[in-house]
């Protein structure tokens, strides 16, 4: 028997079947770095229209976690897809380097500034620590396959950036948005510093919930208001609070002007409460026998005075819109030094902003004899006992409620009035302008707009000053006596900025005021405060984007971060940009959800459900992590677990196998010489290229809309359904058995070449390592890297006007599916082994029959059977299988007649008819020794 194996065009490629990504990717990264791939891309894209994705700086502390990976991978997918779409899309990664977490780390190791080290030495240690953290995170980000200017990232602690942050503040001051005030701010007693809103987290806390009676100063005036004369005992207005420790700072009681307030007689006294809450309050304080003596509107009680239960002064009733009927009594204890609402209403009524609490959270001397020096949270019980002793406590119980805590210490924080610097939301219309700017931004998902609008509409003035060591100095001089800013503040800030640009922030602390103030130095003092770190990152649109040469003065097109950044970076950037320039710093804002485990639980070391990106890369490779990110809908929570990553690895194998099949069958194909013109190609091959064209349209649309899970789904459908289960199956016969240089085979290879050129580019933004690997095995002249080019433009399809158009092949796909069902059943019944042992007869109604007949003898190649006949639908025998999908089709199967050809495996009647090739069929003889078979359709 002759060996015909050598006459077959068997697939062959050096592209490995197994990805072995964890082993191969580091080598590719080394090549990318040695070649300066990022620089090559920049050179290739020079002069193109720009798309700038501005990197929100992660904090330079600790190792990267799965959330960081999601964020950086999403950014990288966008930057690479924009590059392929013809944009110059530079990516400059950044880090947030100042602030409390770094101070705390340095304190743990070296002690607080001023203990073992001077403040200057402490700052140097902080800078050193941040630099090591940046290096560690940078290695991991690079390992993810993220391309960017990693050699020249921006750091908020770069001297030039520090200087530009000071300049940003100067611009805001110049535009009239800064003011100073003793306002209640979030204060952490452990940090001994004010906190930004974004540094506050909420946890459940148990507090005493108390109802307290404030006795009326003028009892008769109240009786007159309620039009009653018979009242048994004193009259009091009752407040409810869960922060008894704030009562020493009480300066008023707020009531709602439009609520009805009832005078209620209880045992031995009368109390005033919101009428709608009488029943719930009576229940709470355990009173069953009570009488409502009268009611008035809250507005009637304005400015009546009530005695503080233990502080020895009286306080007014005032009117406030913040009073609700959700809980309590309808009368709100008001301490302007301990709450933003209280402060606002206190300003309106000219109340004292009393703050009896020191920075360490203990009462200042002279507050009250039993409270001086006591921690406020320990004081609750003392205050409750005091109220009981004075007969003012109506009720006390323990209550669990959501309470603001420090994001770093996880300990409860307080509102505390301290002298601070604020960016005003309203004195120069910043709130109104910001709300206007929000409307001009595209928010993805679109619910982001309502979220940030509500935050901007309701937020207080932004406290930008901090009492910290490691931060950008505010660089202000204020008059010793008046505390007014120096009249040449902007000029002086620029002078400081120039020095900081050379020597870093230490230049401010080293600065002797005389150097720039001269004789005025004795009248002014340096403000010791540093800027909130959210000011650092929030001003990067100015300190980084406006000055980096690769951005060429263009504003950022996109900011992309986790959904917690509406109140964080998106907010601070919007505030600063609008205050500086009157406009938003971004055109699009995209947010992604948080990572959770397979059961939807938050990642937590204590639960042990965290997924380490480093582990995933070391076991499965970065491309699997990237594919998981892309295939997950980032608009909600992003679930990740070993099982979910295993599914991503399965999808990866399907894509890799498709790419490998294409490469293996392009063996010996030179596009410069062997390409077949579209009009000369086999129709099925043109259909396949058309499938790629349709897929590309969908994929590019999805990339444009940032719907990466749609990209992956469409890519999978193309690989699995259109190619894997139809086209690639059909062409194996022609590809392997046709004459090597025949039009039949070269047509097929031409299609595979076009498909591979498109596929490798679709993959590149997501499966960057694998795309680079595939690129290296593709035939033909090309640039060194897939990332420097654009989407493939060589695709074409069938015209609708052709008889065998897309609709024709869609119907053929259905016919093939129906035939497969019949073959599967026959295999199960042991009637045939493989599909080539079968011959089928298709009983079709006229319209379908005409289509099937048009394929002639090539119909059997589409159906993967050795024989295929078309007959009239009405002639179908009883055992023919009726199609469920195509009503005008029945399928009958019989065992193929003739012998099996050992070369092509088809069963035919003409095996051995040619003496020189007695073992193979006539078609194979033609392909081995003759002119080769001709194919028109399939």
From Swiss-Prot:
Catalytic activity: tRNA(Ile) + L-isoleucine + ATP = L-isoleucyl-tRNA(Ile) + AMP + diphosphate
Motif ('HIGH' region): 58-68
GO biological process: isoleucyl-tRNA aminoacylation; response to antibiotic
Binding site for ATP: 602, 605
Keyword flag Nucleotide-binding: yes
One of the record's GO molecular function terms: tRNA binding
InterPro entries found in the cross-reference section: aa-tRNA-synth_I_CS (IPR001412), aa-tRNA-synth_Ia (IPR002300), Anticodon_Ile_BEm (IPR033708), Ile-tRNA-ligase (IPR002301), Ile-tRNA-ligase_type1 (IPR023585), Ile-tRNA_ligase (IPR050081), M/V/L/I-tRNA-synth_anticd-bd (IPR013155), Rossmann-like_a/b/a_fold (IPR014729)
Keywords (A to Z) from UniProt: Acetylation, Aminoacyl-tRNA synthetase, Antibiotic resistance, ATP-binding, Cytoplasm, Ligase, Metal-binding, Nucleotide-binding, Protein biosynthesis, Zinc
Motif ('KMSKS' region): 602-606
Consequence recorded when altering residue 243 to R: Abolishes pretransfer editing
Cofactor(s) demanded: Zn(2+)
Reported effect, residue 738 to P: In strain: EM20031, MRE-600; AA sequence
EC number(s) reported in the record: 6.1.1.5
UniProt-reported outcome of changing residue 97 to S: No effect on activity
Nucleotide-binding listed as a keyword: yes
Amino acids binding Zn(2+): 901, 904, 921, 924
Residues that coordinate or bind L-isoleucyl-5'-AMP: 561
Gene3D superfamilies: 1.10.730.20, HUPs (3.40.50.620), Valyl/Leucyl/Isoleucyl-tRNA synthetase, editing domain (3.90.740.10)
Known outcome of mutating residue 787 to L: In strain: MRE-600; AA sequence
Description of its domains: IleRS has two distinct active sites: one for aminoacylation and one for editing. The misactivated valine is translocated from the active site to the editing site, which sterically excludes the correctly activated isoleucine. The single editing site contains two valyl binding pockets, one specific for each substrate (Val-AMP or Val-tRNA(Ile)).
Job of this protein: Catalyzes the attachment of isoleucine to tRNA(Ile). As IleRS can inadvertently accommodate and process structurally similar amino acids such as valine, to avoid such errors it has two additional distinct tRNA(Ile)-dependent editing activities. One activity is designated as 'pretransfer' editing and involves the hydrolysis of activated Val-AMP. The other activity is designated 'posttransfer' editing and involves deacylation of mischarged Val-tRNA(Ile).
Family: Belongs to the class-I aminoacyl-tRNA synthetase family. IleS type 1 subfamily.
HAMAP family: Ile_tRNA_synth_type1 (MF_02002)
Note: Strain PS102 is resistant to the antibiotic mupirocin (pseudomonic acid A), an Ile-analog that competitively inhibits activation by Ile-tRNA synthetase, thus inhibiting protein biosynthesis.
Protein name: Isoleucine--tRNA ligase
Gene responsible for this protein: ileS
């Amino acid at each position: 028997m002759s060996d015909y194996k050598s006459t077959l065009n068997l697939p062959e490629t050096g592209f490995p079947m197994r990805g072995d990504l964890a082993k191969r990717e580091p080598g590719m990264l080394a090549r990318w770095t040695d070649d300066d791939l990022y620089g090559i891309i920049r050179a290739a894209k020079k002069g193109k229209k720009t798309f700038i994705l501005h990197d929100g700086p992660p904090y330079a502390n600790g190792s990267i976690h799965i959330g960081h990976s999601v964020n950086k991978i999403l950014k990288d997918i966008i930057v690479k897809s924009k590059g392929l779409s013809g944009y110059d899309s530079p990516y400059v990664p950044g880090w947030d380097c100042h602030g409390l977490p770094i101070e705390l780390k340095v304190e743990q190791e070296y002690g607080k500034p001023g203990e073992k080290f001077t403040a200057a030495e402490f700052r140097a240690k902080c800078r050193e620590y941040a630099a090591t953290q940046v290096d560690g995170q940078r290695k991991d980000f690079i390992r993810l396959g993220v391309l960017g200017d990693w050699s020249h990232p921006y750091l908020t602690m770069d001297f030039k950036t520090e200087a530009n942050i000071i300049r940003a503040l100067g611009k805001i001051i110049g535009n009239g948005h800064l003011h100073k005030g003793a306002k209640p701010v979030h204060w952490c007693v452990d940090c001994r510093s004010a906190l930004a809103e974004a540094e506050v987290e909420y946890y459940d806390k148990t507090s005493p919930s108390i109802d307290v009676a404030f006795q009326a100063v003028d009892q008769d005036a109240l009786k007159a208001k309620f039009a009653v004369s018979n009242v048994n005992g004193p009259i009091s207005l009752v407040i409810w609070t869960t922060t008894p420790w704030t009562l020493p700072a009480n300066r008023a009681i707020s009531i709602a002007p439009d609520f009805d307030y009832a005078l209620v007689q209880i045992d031995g006294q009368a109390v005033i409460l919101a009428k709608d809450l009488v029943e719930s309050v009576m229940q709470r304080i355990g009173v069953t026998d009570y009488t409502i003596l009268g009611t008035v509107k809250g507005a009637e009680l304005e400015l009546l005075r009530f005695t503080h239960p233990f502080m020895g002064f009286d306080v007014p009733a005032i009117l406030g819109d913040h009073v609700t009927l959700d809980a309590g009594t309808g009368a709100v204890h008001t301490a302007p030094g301990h709450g933003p609402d209280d402060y606002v209403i206190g300003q309106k009524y000219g109340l004292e902003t009393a703050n009896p609490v020191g920075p360490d959270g203990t009462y200042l001397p002279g507050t009250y004899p039993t409270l001086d020096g006591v921690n406020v949270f320990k004081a609750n019980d003392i205050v409750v006992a005091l109220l009981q002793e004075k007969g003012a406590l109506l009720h006390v119980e323990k209550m669990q409620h959501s309470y603001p805590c420090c994001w770093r210490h996880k300990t409860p924080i307080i509102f505390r009035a301290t002298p601070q610097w604020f960016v005003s939301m309203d004195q120069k219309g910043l709130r109104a302008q910001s709300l206007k700017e929000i409307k001009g931004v595209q928010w993805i998902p679109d619910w982001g707009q309502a979220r940030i609008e509500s935050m901007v509409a309701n937020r207080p003035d932004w406290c930008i000053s901090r009492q910290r060591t490691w931060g950008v100095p505010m660089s202000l001089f204020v008059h010793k006596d008046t505390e007014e800013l120096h009249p040449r503040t902007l000029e002086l800030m620029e002078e400081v900025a120039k020095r900081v640009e050379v020597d870093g922030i230490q230049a401010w602390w080293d600065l002797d005021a005389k150097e720039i103030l001269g004789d005025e130095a004795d009248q002014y003092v340096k403000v010791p405060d540093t800027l909130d770190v959210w000011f650092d990152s929030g001003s990067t649109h100015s300190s980084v984007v406006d000055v980096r040469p690769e951005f060429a003065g263009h504003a950022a097109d996109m900011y992309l971060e986790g959904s917690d950044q509406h109140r964080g970076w998106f907010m601070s950037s919007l505030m600063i940009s609008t205050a500086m320039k009157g406009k938003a710093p971004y055109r699009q804002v995209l947010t992604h959800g948080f990572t959770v485990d397979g059961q939807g639980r938050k990642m937590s070391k204590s639960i042990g459900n965290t997924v380490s990106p480093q582990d995933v890369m070391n076991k499965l490779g970065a491309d699997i992590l990237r594919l998981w990110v892309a295939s997950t809908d980032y608009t909600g929570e992003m679930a990740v677990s070993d099982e979910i990553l295993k599914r991503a690895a399965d999808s990866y194998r399907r894509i890799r196998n498709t790419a490998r099949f294409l490469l293996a069958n392009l063996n010996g194909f030179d596009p410069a010489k062997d390409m077949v013109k579209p009009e000369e190609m086999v129709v099925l091959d043109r259909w396949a290229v058309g499938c790629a064209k349709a897929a590309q349209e969908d994929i590019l649309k999805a990339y444009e809309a940032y719907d990466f899970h749609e990209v992956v789904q469409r890519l999978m459908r193309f690989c699995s359904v259109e190619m894997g289960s139809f086209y690639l199956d059909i062409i194996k016969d022609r590809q392997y058995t046709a004459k090597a240089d025949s039009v039949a085979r070269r047509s097929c290879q031409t299609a595979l070449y076009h498909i591979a050129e498109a596929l490798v580019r679709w993959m590149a933004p997501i499966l960057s390592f694998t795309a680079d690997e595939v690129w290296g095995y593709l035939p033909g002249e090309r640039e060194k890297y897939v990332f420097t080019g654009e989407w493939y433009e060589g695709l074409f399809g069938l015209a609708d006007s052709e008889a065998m158009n897309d609709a024709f092949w869609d119907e053929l796909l259905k016919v093939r599916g129906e035939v497969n069902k019949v073959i599967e059943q026959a295999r199960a019944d042991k009637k045939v082994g493989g599909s080539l042992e079968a011959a089928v007869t298709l009983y079709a109604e006229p319209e379908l029959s005409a289509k099937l007949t048009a394929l002639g003898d090539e119909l059997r190649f589409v159906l993967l059977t050795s024989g295929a006949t078309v007959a009239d639908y009405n002639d179908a025998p009883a055992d023919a299988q009726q199609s469920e999908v195509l009503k005008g089709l029945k399928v009958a199967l019989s065992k193929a007649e003739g012998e099996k050809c050992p070369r092509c495996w088809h069963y035919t009647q003409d095996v051995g008819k040619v003496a020189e090739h007695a073992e193979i069929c006539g078609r194979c003889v033609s392909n081995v020794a003759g002119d080769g078979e001709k194919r028109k359709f399939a």
